[in-house]
């Protein structure tokens, strides 16, 4: 049977339409190898796409604002899609339709920076280029998807020999290339995982449609003229063009996490991001983990990473909260009860229970967003009817078609379990300088403020709507505005659009709230917006560390409703009285209007009907993970050696480290941030700031990293404010740092271990490491060891001699031996001077080659490995 062919005719079309259609057909041929021929008089073809009739199009179109060229092109592309469907090229037809839909969607309604105002669009040269880019990017996405490893179909029922697993363990097991046991995963085990990456920078990418990028931290229209900001803006655009990115949000369209969770993340996905608040995507039951830059960039290039499965704790919600209690007050209550870096430290926080059905996905966003403040690796909600309704209500099918609904086994093992009664949640405030220093608002009334801030990623759309209604109630009561600064910064342009359409932005304006561009703003205090020295602020952001909002400032965090109520008098005010005047029905109606605005997209002809209406709330159909098991390798295929030369190379022989100790305490933080410190950081006026005060123990000041310093330069500033003798002591031979609990807690930045390594530190020993910091150490080539024995810390005084036998997995101190666990993957990374160097050496096969070492354990021992477990000093290691 002859192969179906498609020919076309462009007779009578204007030159602009012919040129644009020709360019699109050339892209189709170049990327997908589908060649259409222009029809000749004697040619026969299975399908002929004739030239559109412009008179018919103009008369029959309801798009009177479109010029004829626009209509010619769109009609031709619709016919092309039908022809591609007819010859079995449905994927290509879908790519064209999706590109057209994005192209015709208003940027403020979710076009992800590609669209202009629908009512004003006319196809001009620059917009022709936009359409061509979209088509090319989505056709390239087909190629990258086909070449990437595909996840297997999940199983309908659980195999009888599969061990009980938590939700996180099931997601990791399903994404794993191979497992250390045929029975599934449990805490402490290692596997190689697929990763959907949210940010990074490498000369190639694994999949151009799985790379989410947004400029939010320091880029802002008021700073666009600054050299460093221009460099970042150019980098955003270069990445979009070079990688043909389908998910490049540009600058000031969305905070990184906001639209990613609202429109892209799906249940059962695995997401990696270079920001500690990546955990926000747990709101839609996506396992989202923040990692350091080296980890994320390598995953971006390879689509692979390695993960030691963390333990999980379980939080079950009970009861029904008051209608005005949103996610921010819930997570503050959890922080109040559990405290920071305690039960959740280095663990995944799994949320569920009967009360979870009263928590919207916006509320869940605020809760999972602040799991990093709780000290957790990430947070994730068990998917339910709330999740299913939210995801299935997305207007575009492409962004709801990859969902996999797992649920934890009833007999899964948790490190700890808790119940949170939602009826006990009230309006709370976390007092400076810690997110867990939480008290009821009613206990601290009349605290005075110089500023009020409603914004940051943790402040969701529903919180912004409620804040506006509280302000409206205050205006109706005739409340005056005391002197002070007020600012509102929604998390994305689509949210801004909804608030504007509903008249709520006008309410914020009437009550004195400035409205700068979308971004992190005061939550970070490193861009155009900064709290002044000595100022006291109340904020709906997620962190209230010292100097977080600006040098010398203090901040307290609470819900948007509490900030709004306090903004009239500039004194802490319980919002209850104003909330009592807000109609719950009106609030609900406004949220439904927000959803309808989000779903207001221009329809594109399709071979099948698609609804953009929110579906009826139903429980999802749960499935079980498909498990890949491969027996441990018995032979070495690769012998790896640390590369010679290069900055920050490990000193001496890694097998045996003999040195002296420099002792630190608990909670050494990478992110107790002094934002305006030193070293060539310019403010909005262009002045250079060269001083600052750091009162909490941190490894490296955050603001310093903006200048992309070397490891050695970072090391020259390590702990310089809190421990001024540290650098000299290390240089004099104290090259082993001993610390307590949660060493490296804070952000995902890898500059902290880089600073220690650059100074000459050979090893850090701690009772526990923050998850991200603990990952960053081997990824940059620095040895880190966990020892839980209290006797060790009684002996480990500054200046004491210490010997570390890495092959023997034992530390010798004051005549006593202390065994430790070090996985082969971690050791391989360290011996190769870190992940970046290993990637340069091995390329996209880096993980396969790093894993090709002989296991020191039998399969039965592999299956029994526990997180950070030590048994009689036995070396424990895993392979895939």
Swiss-Prot record:
SUPFAM superfamilies per UniProt: Aconitase iron-sulfur domain, LeuD/IlvD-like
BP GO terms, sorted: L-leucine biosynthetic process
MF annotations from Gene Ontology: 3-isopropylmalate dehydratase activity; 4 iron, 4 sulfur cluster binding; metal ion binding
Applied relevance: Pneumocandin B0 is the starting molecule for the first semisynthetic echinocandin antifungal drug, caspofungin acetate. Pneumocandin B0 is a minor fermentation product, and its industrial production was achieved by a combination of extensive mutation and medium optimization. Inactivation of three of gloP/GLP450-1, gloO/GLP450-2, and gloM/GLOXY1 generates 13 different pneumocandin analogs that lack one, two, three, or four hydroxyl groups on 4R,5R-dihydroxy-ornithine and 3S,4S-dihydroxy-homotyrosine of the parent hexapeptide.
Metabolic or biological pathway, per its Swiss-Prot or TrEMBL entry: Mycotoxin biosynthesis
Keyword terms of this UniProt record: 4Fe-4S, Amino-acid biosynthesis, Branched-chain amino acid biosynthesis, Iron, Iron-sulfur, Leucine biosynthesis, Lyase, Metal-binding
Record: residues binding [4Fe-4S] cluster: 457, 520, 523
Reaction(s) the record says it catalyses: (2R,3S)-3-isopropylmalate = (2S)-2-isopropylmalate
Record text on cofactor binding: Binds 1 [4Fe-4S] cluster per subunit.
Matches recorded under InterPro entries: Acnase/IPM_dHydase_lsu_aba_1/3, Acoase/IPM_deHydtase_lsu_aba, Aconitase/3IPM_dehydase_swvl, Aconitase_4Fe-4S_BS, Aconitase_4Fe-4S_dom, AconitaseA/IPMdHydase_ssu_swvl, IPM_dehydratase_rel_enz
Required cofactor names: [4Fe-4S] cluster
Family: Belongs to the aconitase/IPM isomerase family. LeuC type 2 subfamily.
Role description: 3-isopropylmalate dehydratase large subunit; part of the gene cluster that mediates the biosynthesis of pneumocandins, lipohexapeptides of the echinocandin family that prevent fungal cell wall formation by non-competitive inhibition of beta-1,3-glucan synthase. The 10,12-dimethylmyristoyl side chain is synthesized by the reducing polyketide synthase gloL/GLPKS4. The thioesterase gloN/GLHYD exclusively interacts with gloL/GLPKS4 to maintain turnover of the polyketide side chain.
PANTHER family in alphabetical order: HOMOACONITASE, MITOCHONDRIAL, HOMOACONITASE, MITOCHONDRIAL-RELATED
Protein name: 3-isopropylmalate dehydratase large subunit gloJ
Organism: Glarea lozoyensis (strain ATCC 20868 / MF5171)
Encoding gene (name): gloJ
């Amino acid at each position: 049977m002859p192969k179906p062919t498609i020919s076309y005719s462009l007779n009578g079309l204007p030159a602009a339409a012919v040129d644009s259609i020709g360019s699109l057909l050339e892209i189709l041929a170049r990327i997908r190898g589908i060649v259409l021929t222009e029809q000749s008089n004697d040619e026969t073809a299975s399908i002929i796409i004739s030239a559109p009739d412009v008179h018919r199009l103009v008369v029959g179109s309801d798009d009177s604002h479109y010029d004829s060229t626009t209509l010619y092109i769109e009609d031709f592309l619709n016919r092309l899609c039908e022809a591609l469907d007819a010859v079995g090229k449905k994927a290509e037809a879908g790519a064209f339709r999706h590109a057209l839909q994005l192209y015709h969607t208003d940027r403020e309604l979710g076009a992800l920076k590609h669209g202009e105002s629908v009512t004003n669009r006319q196809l001009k040269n620059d917009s022709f280029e936009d359409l061509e880019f979209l088509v090319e990017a989505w056709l390239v996405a087909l190629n990258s998807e086909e070449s990437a490893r595909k996840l297997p179909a999940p199983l309908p029922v659980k195999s009888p020999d599969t061990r009980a697993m938590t939700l996180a363990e099931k997601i990791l097991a399903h994404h794993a290339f191979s497992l250390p046991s045929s029975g599934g995963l449990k805490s402490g085990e290692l596997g190689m995982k697929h990763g959907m990456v949210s940010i990074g920078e490498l000369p190639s990418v694994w999949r151009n449609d799985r790379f989410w990028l947004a400029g939010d931290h320091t880029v802002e229209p008021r700073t666009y003229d600054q050299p460093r900001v221009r460099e970042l803006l150019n980098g955003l655009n270069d990445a979009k063009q070079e990688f043909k990115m389908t998910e490049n949000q540009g600058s000031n369209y969305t905070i990184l996490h906001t639209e990613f969770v609202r429109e892209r993340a799906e249940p059962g996905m695995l997401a990696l991001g270079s920001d500690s608040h990546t955990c926000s995507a747990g709101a839609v039951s996506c396992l989202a983990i923040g990692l350091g830059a080296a980890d994320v960039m390598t995953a971006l290039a390879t689509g692979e990473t390695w993960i030691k499965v963390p333990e999980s704790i379980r939080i079950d919600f009970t009861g029904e909260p008051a209608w005005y209690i949103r996610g921010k007050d819930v997570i503050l209550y959890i922080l109040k009860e559990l405290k920071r870096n305690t039960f959740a430290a280095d663990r995944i926080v799994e949320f569920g229970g009967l009360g979870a059905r009263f928590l919207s996905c916006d509320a869940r966003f605020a809760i999972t967003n602040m799991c990093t403040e709780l000290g957790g690796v990430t947070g994730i909600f068990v998917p339910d009817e709330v999740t299913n309704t939210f995801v299935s209500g997305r207007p575009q099918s492409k962004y709801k078609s990859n969902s996999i609904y797992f649920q934890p086994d009833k007999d899964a093992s948790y490190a700890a379990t808790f119940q949170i009664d939602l009826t006990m949640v009230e309006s709370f405030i976390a007092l400076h300088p810690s997110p867990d220093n939480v008290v009821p608002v009613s206990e601290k009334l009349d605290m005075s403020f110089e500023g009020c801030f409603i914004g940051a990623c943790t402040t969701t759309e529903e919180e912004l709507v409620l804040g506006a209604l509280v302000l409206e109630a205050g205006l109706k009561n005739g409340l005056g505005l005391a002197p002070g600064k007020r600012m509102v910064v929604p998390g994305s342009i689509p949210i801004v659009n909804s608030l504007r359409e509903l008249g709520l932005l006008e309410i914020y304006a009437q009550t004195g709230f400035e409205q700068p561009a979308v971004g992190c703003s005061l939550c970070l205090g490193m861009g155009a917006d900064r709290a002044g020295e000595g100022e006291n602020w109340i904020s709906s952001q997620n962190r209230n560390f010292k100097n977080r909002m600006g040098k010398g400032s203090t901040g307290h965090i609470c819900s948007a409703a509490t900030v709004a109520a306090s903004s009239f008098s500039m004194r802490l005010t319980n919002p209850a009285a104003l909330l009592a005047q807000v109609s719950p029905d009106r609030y609900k109606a406004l949220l439904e209007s927000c959803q309808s605005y989000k779903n207001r997209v221009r329809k594109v002809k399709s071979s099948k009907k698609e609804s953009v209406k929110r579906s009826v709330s139903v429980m999802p159909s749960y499935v079980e993970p498909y498990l890949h098991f491969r027996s441990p390798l018995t032979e070495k295929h690769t012998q790896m050696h640390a590369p010679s030369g290069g900055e920050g190379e490990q000193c001496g022989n890694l097998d045996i480290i003999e040195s002296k100790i420099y002792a630190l305490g608990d909670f050494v933080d990478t992110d107790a941030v002094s934002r305006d410190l030193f070293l060539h950081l310019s403010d909005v006026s262009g002045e250079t700031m060269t001083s600052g005060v750091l009162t909490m123990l941190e490894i490296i000041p955050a603001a310093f990293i903006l200048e992309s310093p070397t490891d050695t330069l970072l090391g020259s500033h390590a702990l310089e404010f809190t421990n001024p003798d540290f650098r000299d002591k290390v240089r004099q031979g104290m090259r082993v740092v001993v610390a307590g609990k949660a060493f490296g807690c804070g952000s995902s930045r890898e500059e902290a271990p880089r600073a220690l390594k650059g100074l000459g530190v050979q090893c850090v020993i701690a009772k526990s490491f923050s998850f991200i910091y603990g990952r960053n150490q081997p990824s940059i080539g620095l040895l880190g060891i966990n020892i839980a024995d209290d006797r060790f810390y009684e002996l480990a005084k500054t200046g004491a001699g210490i010997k570390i036998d890495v092959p023997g997995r034992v530390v010798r101190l004051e005549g006593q031996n202390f065994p430790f666990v070090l996985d082969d993957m971690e050791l391989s990374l360290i011996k190769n001077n870190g992940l970046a160097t290993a990637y340069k050496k091995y390329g996209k096969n880096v993980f396969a080659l790093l894993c090709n070492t002989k296991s020191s354990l039998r399969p039965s021992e592999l299956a029994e490995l526990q997180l950070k477990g030590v048994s009689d000093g036995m070396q424990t290691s895993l392979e895939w």
